[in-house]
């Protein structure tokens, strides 16, 4: 469940550099997947993200 700086996992989501202690990012856009991020929250177990980005 912990995120590291080099592609650790956060729950179901594979992460790059994380936003916050355990927040995934959107890969193509590089912005946070979360309530405050432009991509919106991550949805579903395959890392799809609301807003057209991917985690």
UniProtKB/Swiss-Prot annotation:
Keyword Repeat (UniProt): yes
Protein name per its UniProtKB record: Male-specific sperm protein Mst84Dc
Similarity annotation: Belongs to the MST(3)CGP family.
Tissue: Testis.
Notes concerning its domains: This protein is mostly composed of repetitive C-G-P motifs.
Keywords: Developmental protein, Differentiation, Repeat, Spermatogenesis
Higher taxonomy: Eukaryota, Metazoa, Ecdysozoa, Arthropoda, Hexapoda
One GO biological process term: sperm axoneme assembly
The UniProt record lists the keyword Repeat: yes
């Amino acid at each position: 469940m912990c995120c590291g700086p080099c592609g650790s996992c956060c729950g179901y989501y594979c992460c790059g550099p994380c936003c916050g202690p355990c927040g995934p990012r959107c890969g193509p856009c590089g912005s946070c997947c979360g309530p405050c991020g432009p991509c919106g929250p991550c949805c579903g177990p395959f890392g799809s993200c609301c807003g057209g980005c991917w985690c």
